[in-house]
From Swiss-Prot:
Protein name: High frequency lysogenization protein HflD homolog
Topological type in the membrane: Peripheral membrane protein
Listed InterPro entries: HflD, HflD-like_sf
Chief place of localization: cytoplasm
């Protein structure tokens, strides 16, 4: 059966968007607020009608992820910021495979996310309460699967009270995108053997987005 590279590319961009946001948070203490909202909201939507619907139904919501994906796919340098993004992206893929193969882990994750939906009736998605709740899910359900993702950045930033919770919540969004990626036919071999196909698809999607003003 032919693979749907449109859906695969969108889901992969979702993983890369989380990786980029984690990087921004770890180095600067803040990140692209709109992209963060899209990524965090993707955790909550358990029954989307399509791959694009997971990310709010608009390709523009994944602009950060698509641009990051192109950087990861075409990284000539294995050092510096691009290497960080590649490491985060691949680490999320590895953890997703461990999540999917761990008995009962996906059910536990689903139950915990249902709890988030109840909290959303009283708190905003980016409130400290929700961030802490999402971070706790990552710590309780994802971290024990190992290996842990080593987040690198500014020590002063990473020691501030709110940033670690935001980073973990964003990593949880990355896991959600990685689950989706596998569901639509994604696999790590594509990063080696279908790189050109993925690059072309990402460029095509970006080409018909309205330019940022």
């Amino acid at each position: 059966m032919a693979k749907n590279y449109y859906d695969i590319t969108l889901a992969l961009a979702g993983i890369c968007q989380s990786a980029r946001l984690v990087q921004q948070l770890a180095h600067q203490g803040h990140c692209d607020a709109d992209a963060l909202h899209v990524s965090l909201n993707s955790i909550i939507d358990m029954n989307p009608s399509s791959t694009l619907a997971v990310f709010g139904g608009s390709e523009a919501n994944l602009r950060v992820g698509l641009e990051t994906l192109l950087g990861v796919l075409n990284a000539s340098s294995r050092q510096g910021l691009n290497a960080e993004l590649t490491r985060y992206t691949l680490s999320l893929m590895v953890l997703e495979r461990k999540l999917s193969s761990a008995k009962g882990a996906l059910d536990t994750l689903g139950n915990r996310i249902n709890g988030l939906q109840r909290q959303l009736e009283h708190f905003d998605l980016q409130s400290e309460t929700l961030m802490s709740a999402m971070a706790a899910i990552y710590v309780d359900v994802i971290s024990p699967l190992g290996p842990r993702i080593q987040v690198t950045g500014s020590p002063a930033v990473l020691q501030s009270p709110q940033v670690p919770a935001k980073v973990r919540a964003t990593l949880l969004a990355g896991i959600r995108a990685a689950v989706l990626w596998h569901q639509v036919g994604g696999g790590r071999l594509q990063l080696m053997f279908s790189r050109n196909r993925l690059t072309t698809q990402a460029k095509q999607i970006l080409a018909h987005l309205t330019p940022e003003l």
